[in-house]
Structure formats: structure tokens, C-alpha cells
UniProtKB/Swiss-Prot annotation:
<keyword id="KW-0479">Metal-binding</keyword>
<dbReference type="GO" id="GO:0008758">
    <property type="term" value="F:UDP-2,3-diacylglucosamine hydrolase activity"/>
</dbReference>
<feature type="binding site">
    <location>
        <position position="11"/>
    </location>
    <ligand>
        <name>Mn(2+) 1</name>
    </ligand>
</feature>
<feature type="binding site">
    <location>
        <position position="166"/>
    </location>
    <ligand>
        <name>substrate</name>
    </ligand>
</feature>
<feature type="binding site">
    <location>
        <position position="81"/>
    </location>
    <ligand>
        <name>Mn(2+) 2</name>
    </ligand>
</feature>
<feature type="binding site">
    <location>
        <position position="169"/>
    </location>
    <ligand>
        <name>substrate</name>
    </ligand>
</feature>
<dbReference type="InterPro" id="IPR043461">
    <property type="entry name" value="LpxH-like"/>
</dbReference>
<feature type="binding site">
    <location>
        <position position="162"/>
    </location>
    <ligand>
        <name>substrate</name>
    </ligand>
</feature>
<dbReference type="InterPro" id="IPR029052">
    <property type="entry name" value="Metallo-depent_PP-like"/>
</dbReference>
<keyword id="KW-0441">Lipid A biosynthesis</keyword>
<dbReference type="GO" id="GO:0019897">
    <property type="term" value="C:extrinsic component of plasma membrane"/>
</dbReference>
<feature type="binding site">
    <location>
        <position position="116"/>
    </location>
    <ligand>
        <name>Mn(2+) 2</name>
    </ligand>
</feature>
<dbReference type="InterPro" id="IPR010138">
    <property type="entry name" value="UDP-diacylglucosamine_Hdrlase"/>
</dbReference>
<comment type="function">
    <text>Hydrolyzes the pyrophosphate bond of UDP-2,3-diacylglucosamine to yield 2,3-diacylglucosamine 1-phosphate (lipid X) and UMP by catalyzing the attack of water at the alpha-P atom. Involved in the biosynthesis of lipid A, a phosphorylated glycolipid that anchors the lipopolysaccharide to the outer membrane of the cell.</text>
</comment>
<protein>
    <recommendedName>
        <fullName>UDP-2,3-diacylglucosamine hydrolase</fullName>
        <ecNumber>3.6.1.54</ecNumber>
    </recommendedName>
</protein>
<dbReference type="GO" id="GO:0005737">
    <property type="term" value="C:cytoplasm"/>
</dbReference>
<keyword id="KW-0464">Manganese</keyword>
């Protein structure tokens, strides 16, 4: 049976065209063209200020994803903490299906819960408070009414502050809370969890379920999770 592929945390930006080139190479590969489905679990872009922003980066990525979709490859997207404002307009342009924060898939007989992963980091209370605020629909609507330049400046400032705060935060609170994560997996009746966000690529075998953490992408290394009837394995992008 055709495999499914999972990626997250590419953090694409015009400042790092090498990362965009890596993604486009994968999307154009025969492996992607023959996939059962491709799941992008958030932070595809380093930041997103609205579907009305038109750039060479956004357009080229949407165009290549659309080509896969037109070939019959299902492409799914879960919003991340950097690109949570991606909406239906961009997803339609790219031929992607927008998924909610949590979804359960039947992958080759294994009930699999997928999410970006930021909601699992409950020990980072400051971030969770911030997340709750910026996910308010009314606030998002007001933000998207601002001129594009204002939105970009505000997003850049918030990103700068977030980066500074991250440097002084204890590493453990930026990882998932084990107890909360286990409860979520049980609540959804899943046997496996796949998420990104923490950038700590690993396959964990925990009490009663498998937790797979996707890695972030770098110019010199990127990996893709391949899932098929034989299980799940990380494959270096260079193999494609």
C-alpha cells in the first residue's frame, strides 16, 4: 500500500531560500507523487499574517502542493503556532485540506492522533495564555482588518520577543507534559501520536502508546516521517 508522509516545523521564510528549495524538491519527487497522503503538521511558514499576503514564497509553495493534489495525492494541513492564521483561502489555492487542532487517522490499522504539538506543552503557562488570546476569533478578525504592513510589523515584533523569552525558559517546560499527553491520547482512543513543535525528533514507546515527534528542518539536515504497513520510520530528505 502507498505510504503516508509527515512533516512539520519547516519555518519557511524568504530569508532562508534553501529550506524552500528542500521542500520543493520533496514535493516534486516520485515518492511524494506516489504517496497515499502528505500531512503537514504546522509551522510550514515562519510566520503568517493573512491569506491576502502574496509573495513568491507563498505562491511557489502553494503551486507545488497544488500539483500534487491535482495528481490525486491528498495533502492535509494542521495549523502551527507560527502559521495559525492560515485560512481556507490559502488551503484552497494549494489544494490542501485544513484539519482541526486534533485529528484521529486510521493509518494501516493503527488509530493515530495527530496535532501540531503546542497544545501539549501545558507546563509553559505563559505560552498557553498567549495562545488562548491570539486564537480568539474576534481578535483574529480585527487583526486581519489591519493594513498588511502593520500586521507584518506586529508579527515581527512578537516573534522577536518570543525568541528572547525562549532563550531564558527552562527546556523542560517547552516539551510536552507527559501526563496531559497520555490523557489526550486515551481520550481520543488512539494507539499512536504524531506531533511536531518541540523540534525533538524521536520515536518514544510510552505506556500504552507510541509517541512520534517530528523534527524541524535545517539547511544541512531534514527528515520526513514515512508511515506504511510496516510501521513508521524517519527518512533523511536526501534519500528523495
Amino acid at each position: 500500500m502507498k505510504p503516508a508522509y509527515f512533516i512539520s516545523d519547516l519555518h519557511l521564510s524568504e530569508k532562508q531560500p534553501e529550506l524552500t528549495a528542500l521542500l520543493l524538491r520533496f514535493l516534486r519527487s516520485s515518492a511524494a507523487g506516489q504517496a497515499r497522503a502528505i500531512y503537514i503538521l504546522g509551522d510550514l511558514f515562519d510566520f503568517w499574517v493573512g491569506d491576502d499576503e502574496v509573495s513568491e514564497l507563498n505562491t511557489s509553495v502553494a503551486r507545488e502542493i497544488r500539483k500534487l493534489s491535482d495528481k490525486g495525492v491528498a495533502v492535509f494541513f494542521v495549523r502551527g503556532n507560527r502559521d495559525f492564521l492560515i485560512g481556507q483561502d490559502f488551503c484552497r489555492q494549494a489544494g490542501m485540506t485544513l484539519l482541526p487542532d486534533y485529528s484521529v487517522l486510521d493509518l494501516f490499522g493503527c488509530k493515530t492522533l495527530i496535532c501540531h504539538g503546542d497544545t501539549l506543552c501545558t507546563d509553559d503557562r505563559a505560552y498557553q495564555r498567549f495562545r488562548k488570546i491570539v486564537h480568539r476569533k474576534r481578535l483574529q478578525k480585527l487583526f486581519l482588518m489591519l493594513p498588511l504592513k502593520w500586521r507584518t510589523r506586529l508579527a515581527t515584533k512578537i516573534r522577536r520577543v518570543s525568541k528572547m523569552e525562549k532563550q531564558v525558559k527552562p527546556a523542560d517546560i517547552m516539551d510536552v507534559n507527559a501526563a496531559f499527553t497520555a490523557r489526550q491520547v486515551r481520550a481520543f482512543g488512539a494507539e499512536r501520536l504524531i506531533h511536531g513543535h518541540t523540534h525533538r525528533e524521536h520515536i518514544h514507546h510510552e505506556n500504552g502508546f507510541t509517541r512520534i515527534v517530528l523534527g524541524d528542518w535545517h539547511n544541512d539536515y531534514a527528515s520526513i516521517l514515512r508511515v506504511d504497513g510496516d510501521g513508521a520510520v524517519f527518512v533523511p530528505l536526501e534519500k528523495y
